[in-house]
Amino acid sequence: MTATIIDTDLLTQARSAVETAQGVIHTGIATAKESGTADQDQQLVYSLAHAASAAAMAESALTYAQTGDDEARLAHVFIGRQLTDLASMLWARSSDWGVEPSALDATRAYAAQVTAPAFVGLAAAAPGSANLPDDLAMVATTFRQFANERVAPYAEAIHRHDLDIPQEIIDGVAELGCFGLSIPEEYGGSASGSEDDYMAMVIATEELSTASLGAGGSLITRPEILARAIEAGGTDEQKQQWLPAIASGETLCAVAVTEPDFGSDVANLKVSASPEEGGWRINGVKTWCTFAGRANALMVLARTNPDPEAKHRGLSLFVVDKPSDDGHDFRHEVNGGTLEGRAIATLGYRGMHSFEVSFTDWFVPAANLIGGEEGLGRGFYLQMAGFENGRIQTAA
């Protein structure tokens, strides 16, 4: 890092701007509470939540800005863009937030300065230091080397020809412990329960993605989601059965939530799981199930309560075992049921392949209902516990 000559005046302006933004957001939240219409105005609630998250990140950026000149420029650009986004939210709906349209005017000069092309260009030319402790810096170095040596040589061919990810990459990622970054040590993973667990996962994802998103960084997402769901609501037996296998890479995972007619509108999902002796029969179609071919375990969100009024409370989460398949399609007939998948052509996200998966009377043992009997109706909540971690990884 070069000698630090941080512009303290600009930093003071940034701090004042963030405080102004936080005040506007707090007023908006209070206004929404007082109106009693939050349930009816989900767009407003979403905007407030988005703005509050952005303001919290901007506040953290103020600390980062004090570590060096390059870091300060990056922080200023980030804060300026968050202020610009907030201003656009207020432009048409300031009255709903309980503030005047001019509420952010005091921040305009600062935002204009730090989002100007010349200023942004300086920030882009000097990305700054990651400021990682030694152990996490080693994580970055290890995965950067793996990405350069083992992933990058295959990346172009995988993308241009929509090839499968070579087993060499999957085995290498498993050997590095990638699939167990968020799985507790007692189940064969490396998570110790500290915030560094998240950082290690984010760093590994970033480094692998520099070589290839589809054939590197995104390999970790599905194991993260399923493992977190099992940790959040699985029985002790299920944790012992599945978590070590996920951590080692023996079990490769895919997620089956989205449906053709409903997207991710979870409350109205239709894929059903009907009880029968010893287990369940699943029927319906899921789509955008990335890695569903190669995976030998699908996390499936299905409706176990047929009453449509049950909405998201009528959903349960299953681990559906299947054979691992190469290529762009698969079909299996077992126990009187059929499981069939076809890859969906995608523009830039190749290697793992995203599938449409059809279940016809596909049998799932009772032991594969996450949480057992206590997991009935908890599928949405367990899925969200998984997605919470998976989305952090996806953002990386």
Language model features with spans:
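Glycine-rich beta->alpha junctions and the first turn(s) of the following alpha-helix
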Residues: 2-56, 128-139, 335-396
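Short secondary-structure subsegments characteristic of cysteine-rich extracellular domains
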Residues: 58-84
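N-terminal glycine-rich flavin-associated loop
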Residues: 216-236, 263
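A short, Trp-centered hydrophobic/proline-enriched beta-strand micro-motif
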Residues: 249-257
